[in-house]
From Swiss-Prot:
InterPro entries: EPHD, PHD-type_Zinc_Finger, Znf_PHD, Znf_RING/FYVE/PHD. It comes from the Eukaryota. A zinc finger (C2HC pre-PHD-type) spans 42-78. The keyword Cell division does not apply. GO terms for molecular function: zinc ion binding. One of its GO terms (cellular component) is nucleus. A zinc finger (PHD-type) spans 108-160. Keywords: Activator, Metal-binding, Nucleus, Transcription, Transcription regulation, Zinc, Zinc-finger. Positive regulator of Th1-type cytokine gene expression. This is PHD finger protein 11. Interacts with BRCA1 and RELA.
Length: 337
């Protein structure tokens, strides 16, 4: 068979391949930082219970971590490593901070689906609801975002307060991203040592109406106590008391970790102190802790007494040694003369 020159379609395919190869050479490869994932590279969000293709995805190749942009932005304890710039669509997430948030989420169960990894908490300080971001969406939680300052908050449907100081308030079910309606180039997220809180610690307190009469308030508290008592009885009957107290212990452990963090804010100390010390449940605990303080004082005084005796012994030894050396020097002088 005679060898024929390349046909027109084959030439076209060759040109297309060359153009595609050149385009791939231009696109920067991931270098261990979070980057918007390409469509052909499947990445699973580390903060979601399942892979949902409805948010910008960042990933760190060196750590094998991927997370949706919204899961990062609305996670309660996560910070960005640079000041927010409204004119720049890129986000700045510190890899170590993301790893720490993933670890924190392993202890938190989602209010909606019951699975671990729920790092998005209701911003009302007295509310203990935690979600995965998309579970919060399914539970009709309300998103509050301020594009000028880069503040992102989530309130559960029960505690959503339209009278707040954030300009953008909308249900999570109505949140969409422009990244899927237009072509976007791969974007990088940089990493630096400068971290900035996104303002989640400035929680908004939803105050109950003060128009209720005192009698109604007492009746309400009594009814609330009856409901809670019935809840505990049903937990006991269902064999779920261990699970309930496991959740309580997990919460206390998280509070301890929060206090041990070097970046703990003054508002966090105030919030945790109020929650712990205003609860009658811990009155006996505080009394016992006072005894522990007294015991620590006693042990410290005992160590101080022992140190004093040790210092006196060393000083006496030093004086004896000096006297011995002086006597030896005098004897040597007498012999030489």
């Amino acid at each position: 068979m005679d060898t024929a020159g390349p046909s027109a379609p084959e030439s076209t395919r060759g040109a297309s391949w060359s153009e595609a190869q050149a385009a791939r050479d231009i696109v920067p490869l991931p270098t261990g930082v979070f980057q918007v994932a390409e469509r052909l590279q499947k990445r699973i969000c580390a903060l979601c219970p399942k892979d949902l293709e409805c948010s910008v995805l960042y990933f760190a190749q060196s750590e094998n971590i991927a997370a949706h942009e919204n899961c990062l932005l609305y996670s309660s304890a996560l910070v960005e490593c640079e000041d927010y710039d409204p004119s720049n669509n890129d986000r700045n997430f510190d890899v170590e901070s993301v790893k720490k948030e993933i670890k924190r989420g392993r202890k938190l169960k989602c209010t909606f689906c019951g699975k671990k990894g729920a790092t998005v908490g209701c911003d009302l300080k007295s509310c203990f609801k935690n979600y995965h971001f998309f579970c919060a969406k399914n539970d009709h939680a309300v998103l509050q975002a301020d594009g000028r300052t880069g503040i992102y908050k989530v309130f559960c449907q029960q505690h959503a307060d339209p009278q707040n100081d954030l300009p953008s308030v909308k249900p999570l079910s109505g949140v969409f991203h422009s990244h899927y309606s237009e072509q976007t180039k791969p974007r990088h997220a940089c990493f630096s040592g400068v971290k900035r809180k996104r303002g989640r610690s400035k929680r908004h307190h939803v105050q109950p109406p003060e128009r209720m009469a005192l009698k109604k308030e007492k009746d309400g508290r009594h009814t609330d106590a009856i409901v809670k008592a019935a809840f505990l009885k049903k937990c006991k009957e269902a064999g779920l008391l261990d699970a309930l107290f496991e959740e309580i212990l997990d919460k206390l452990h998280l509070i301890q970790e929060r206090l041990m963090d070097e970046t703990t804010a003054e508002s966090d100390y105030e919030e945790i102190g109020t929650s712990l010390f205003d609860c009658r449940l811990f009155e006996d605990t505080l009394v016992n802790f006072q005894a522990a303080i007294e015991n620590q004082i006693h042990q410290s005084e005992e160590r101080r007494r022992q140190l004093k005796e040790e210092i006196e012994l060393l000083q006496d030894l030093k004086q004896t040694l000096c006297s011995g050396l002086q006597s030896s020097s005098t004897s040597d002088s007498s012999l030489s003369s």
